[in-house]
Amino acid sequence: MRTRVLRCRPFSTRILLLLLFVLAFGVYCYFYNASPQNYNKPRISYPASMEHFKSSLTHTVKSRDEPTPDQCPALKESEADIDTVAIYPTFDFQPSWLRTKEFWDKSFEDRYERIHNDTTRPRLKVIVVPHSHNDPGWLKTFEQYFEWKTKNIINNIVNKLHQYPNMTFIWTEISFLNAWWERSHPVKQKALKKLIKEGRLEITTGGWVMPDEACTHIYALIDQFIEGHHWVKTNLGVIPKTGWSIDPFGHGATVPYLLDQSGLEGTIIQRIHYAWKQWLAERQIEEFYWLASWATTKPSMIVHNQPFDIYSIKSTCGPHPSICLSFDFRKIPGEYSEYTAKHEDITEHNLHSKAKTLIEEYDRIGSLTPHNVVLVPLGDDFRYEYSVEFDAQYVNYMKMFNYINAHKEIFNADVQFGTPLDYFNAMKERHQNIPSLKGDFFVYSDIFSEGKPAYWSGYYTTRPYQKILARQFEHQLRSAEILFTLVSNYIRQMGRQGEFGASEKKLEKSYEQLIYARRNLGLFQHHDAITGTSKSSVMQDYGTKLFTSLYHCIRLQEAALTTIMLPDQSLHSQSIIQSEVEWETYGKPPKKLQVSFIDKKKVILFNPLAETRTEVVTVRSNTSNIRVYDTHKRKHVLYQIMPSITIQDNGKSIVSDTTFDIMFVATIPPLTSISYKLQEHTNTSHHCVIFCNNCEQYQKSNVFQIKKMMPGDIQLENAVLKLLVNRNTGFLRQVYRKDIRKRTVVDVQFGAYQSAQRHSGAYLFMPHYDSPEKNVLHPYTNQNNMQDDNIIIVSGPISTEITTMYLPFLVHTIRIYNVPDPVLSRAILLETDVDFEAPPKNRETELFMRLQTDIQNGDIPEFYTDQNGFQYQKRVKVNKLGIEANYYPITTMACLQDEETRLTLLTNHAQGAAAYEPGRLEVMLDRRTLYDDFRGIGEGVVDNKPTTFQNWILIESMPGVTRAKRDTSEPGFKFVNERRFGPGQKESPYQVPSQTADYLSRMFNYPVNVYLVDTSEVGEIEVKPYQSFLQSFPPGIHLVTLRTITDDVLELFPSNESYMVLHRPGYSCAVGEKPVAKSPKFSSKTRFNGLNIQNITAVSLTGLKSLRPLTGLSDIHLNAMEVKTYKIRF
């Protein structure tokens, strides 16, 4: 459907302009026609401003300075001893040992015998680490687990370590430790601190939880590490030195980077692909330095991989689970399991044989290392909740340890209880030649359930409603953090002059809710929360916590903006500035509040990013006679009036005459709030035109033109893009870029894999290979397979969109913007509403959105995914494996590319993505599996909620393409794909997004915050037109957060100190449009407006270690991709 913009000038110029336009239009259609021949193309015209017409048609971009190498460095791939991308496809994924579930075969046993008999080899040293893995929610909620298990476990740690001076323990989940601390007697608190000071109880990792590493976003990861580390430092007086990450389902490079930046010396990982376990064991590699994928300084933190399947005693004492089971001495009355069946206490009669068997298993682990130091976890999920287990494990193991250590002539070993820090210290004394590794360990696969490979790629997508809610909450928390820090310190400093006393107290009171919000976000980063892999009732509890804290964050934002935007302080105690979105209840989509000329005719926008942005904002109104006025620039802005359309049960569309969406364009400086006024005004040129074949015949809209759609395929068009839409489906078919006259096939499809029953569930993804892909839309399609009656097109001065409906299952919208912005005009927004309906409908359905393109990304397809919104990873299809093993996690984007074109798909939540066939990119949207996949939760996933998915598509030129080339291969296309190659340029080996994609991703994840000014109780009031909190901040730097530090003495009160966490994103200046010069340098002019900084210090990522004092913000420097933290005292 073509859109054209036209406005009549006064009579003297109107006819001339009209003739010129018709002539230009005819020439344009002849040369740049992008539609198939011999079909009747609909033409649409509607009035708009001439300024918009010019900018939209020509879309000239202001001249920009060329970026310097410092502003846009060409990043290089790091060089490592182990490259996971190169090595992984070479594995034998069906080795002969799968049926035994143990890779330990004769070759390993023979090597063990040789090493055991080598008299020059260092003596075996074994560090046994008692632990209890406490999930902060899984089969039960956080609170239920704490009351049922965890508080008893921590009490037993305190009591039994005092009783047994040789025993040690570790603790990782600070969320649980905080709950215990708040309820424990000071005597117990002191006893616990004493154990930590003695080094017998080690706090490992120190995060609020043990986070998932596939679905988490960098903001939430950093935030929960800061929250946990500060709790540890404040309450226990220590700084974590080692990490313990034994249960996340696969491991990526981001968490090791963050831990290294936080000052940890070593970390331990567990769950990686069974083939990686074998490969590393064969090469005696248990430790490595995990490099970032881009060339940067070598990390100082060492990563240790546990060599066997899982962290339970059955799998940790050595390569033979049947032997290890007999060394689990837990025996609780009424408990019967595989380990109780083999239970046998150590006595003087079996001491020698048991000690010999145990040390042989330990020695076998030692043969997998060059240094002969062995770390052996001793525990399992929620272990040691009974004091008798402490007694049994300690007494039996100490008998064997004492016997082994007393008979070195027989065993040649030292065995002791210890901690991970003890292990790393002992290992480093013997081993310095540690290899480096780059890449990651996704997809995780196990074989210990059935002796068959099972791929844990389902959880990348499971329960998308909660994944989306979590990201929305991140955005609201981040905005609340920044506003609280800026406004509270502003009024504190102004308060010295006697102002803002009441406002300061109100904000201080809200700080407690900010702490709870941080902790609820941190809790959801747990590897059974954001993954969607807890029981349905537990997921409901997580969601309710997120929803509650999201509500409080929005209220805090409103209070902060009320203080700063309303000059009349007597109004600060009232709820006048209100979010334009109402979150009524968990599980339901948010609603927009209506603006009104009676009491809500002012809108405030806050840009939470530290960079200027142009955004299209939509507010709801009860009138269409309206226009938008920027009170700061004192001018009217570009806007359009859109209909509110209701779909009836019979599929008929009702266009409302009482509810309207006002869409306008706003350009907002960094960390700035601007007020807009909605003025009564009648101008139908700003009203959208509706094309609809199935709108009620009797309905005659008094506001909008409603027209029938014309025959033929549908085109959406702005000044830069021309989209061809398949009329039979309503989905995108191809994209034509006018600036380089190039067509790209982008065929959007929706389908589903049928789940393999009992092999696909919350964790696992396994399609039923004997069943074809499911045509999920067929039951919701018209009998004639034509979508005409289910398509609505809405076209206006700012946007054009097409919506196609397969009710009630799926509603899909394609939107492009016709605004003078180089980013928004080049991007395509896809919005998909999915409702699985109540089970058993759509059972065993793994729903995907697929983009089939003509991009030549290799016969063995390659694509790129982000990792945690921080870095980027190349993915190569492994032909030996099925689709389930070729799905990878994304959190912000994925892209396909060849020598000429890159397609980037942006997302605002975690989901799985694959490029299983050449030119194809698909993302999983939602999953419903009726059956459990036998990985612990004991139920399927049937609690699907109606969910709205949003994605942006960017299609960009790769380096070397400078202009179009004639291509007559497609009928109707003229002068397409013409190009010429410029001088040879060295491309950046490390693939990063374009500057446009990087910027659009941040806009997508951190949208403008919109508020209404409610004057229903106070009448007309003064609202400041503009409030900027930042000046001369370098646009090449992303402000991750500006987070107030809690007072050292008053636990729930804020201090005047904050952490400013910064990230310098890496992006390519060679891909896509000519980049804007974005300086990463801070200057003497960089400041927070209205705030005095007493001092600033460079600190470790979580702030526990001071690195160096700075003279001011101008001393800050970040290299590309780096994340750094600075402590600011206001």
UniProtKB/Swiss-Prot annotation:
Binds 1 zinc ion per subunit. Residues 1-14 are cytoplasmic. Zn(2+) binds at residues 133, 135, 247, 527. The chain crosses the membrane at residues 15-35. Signal peptide: none annotated. Pfam families: Alpha-mann_mid, Glyco_hydro_38C, Glyco_hydro_38N. Belongs to the glycosyl hydrolase 38 family. Catalyzes the first committed step in the biosynthesis of complex N-glycans. It controls conversion of high mannose to complex N-glycans; the final hydrolytic step in the N-glycan maturation pathway. This is Alpha-mannosidase 2.
